[in-house]
Amino acid sequence: MIFKVARCELHSWEEPVISGTKGSGTVFFCGCSMRCVFCQNYNISRSANSGLSITEDELLQLFFSLEQEGAHNINLVTPSHYAKPLKRVLEKFKKASTLPIVYNTNAYESVENLKLLDGLVDIYLPDLKYVSSKLSLDFSARADYFEKAYPAILEMQRQQPRNIIENGIMQKGLIVRHLVLPNCTEDSKEVLDALSRMPKKPLVSIMSQYFPTEPVMNHPVLNRKISIREYEKVTDYASVLGFDGFTQDLKSATVAYTPSFDLSILKSRLKRIKD
């Protein structure tokens, strides 16, 4: 099986319990099951054929190279369309390493897909983007987003019901992310309501990093960053509901926190591995 990969490096911009002091060993896969008009990684998400072609053995060696550099974990970004071959790679990696595996996903995937990885994924890091089918259709071309994502997140919690954090670094568990969008705070509150109905309230990461990318510069709803008031409306509601988790400084809403997908960096890493 061939994977399409755009980046494989230590990443310091995840939640503190994921990035820690040394970085998260992050692998960005190309392609995506959604079509978010505001995607900040749109240059790799729009096509599964972008990036470099990587074999299963090469992917395994990339994992080991990140471990050797001190990564706190292996962080798989948008991996759902590779679940079956990933299972084979992860089974081999787990035999040789105790490093936690992070599954970083938009949550628009099947429960069956996730069950393939039961016992192989240590930390689930899903988004819950919307409850509103109108917003998910208008912004991501997926009217059934919540209908698929919510059961998927319940399955993630079934697999990893306890959050285990050692020396400030998560070893097992679930963190649900939510990106606050401009003019959409009521739906953000509905997202939190839905998460509060789970068997156990998950840790939540309420993100303020939205900024309009080129495709939505003139969008009637998405053409600006969120305001302090919008963000506080959501974080205050999370506090009322009793959530624990993570917030962001609004200064994070900048392209400076978007990773570089310069393929020469990945080519250089592959060359070092082979040498």
Describe the function of each predicted region.
Residues M1-G119, I123, S132-K134:
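Conserved Radical SAM active-site core
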Residues G25, I74, I101-Y103, Y124-P126, ...:
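Hydrophobic faces of well-ordered beta-strands that scaffold small-molecule active sites
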Residues I44-E58, V77-R88, F93, E109-S110, ...:
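Conserved non-cysteine loop/helix-boundary elements of the Radical SAM core domain that shape
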Residues S65, K92, L116, E155, ...:
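Alpha-helical scaffold elements within enzyme catalytic domains, especially in hydrolases
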Residues S80-Y82, A107-E109, Y130-S132, V180, ...:
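Active-site-proximal loop/turn and secondary-structure-junction residues that shape catalytic pockets
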Residues L90-E91, L117-D118, S140-R142, P259-I265:
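Short low-complexity, flexible loop/linker segments enriched in glycine and/or proline
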Residues D118-L135, K201-Y210:
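Non-cysteine beta-strand/loop elements that form the S-adenosyl-L-methionine
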Residues P161-D275:
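Auxiliary Fe-S-binding modules of radical SAM enzymes
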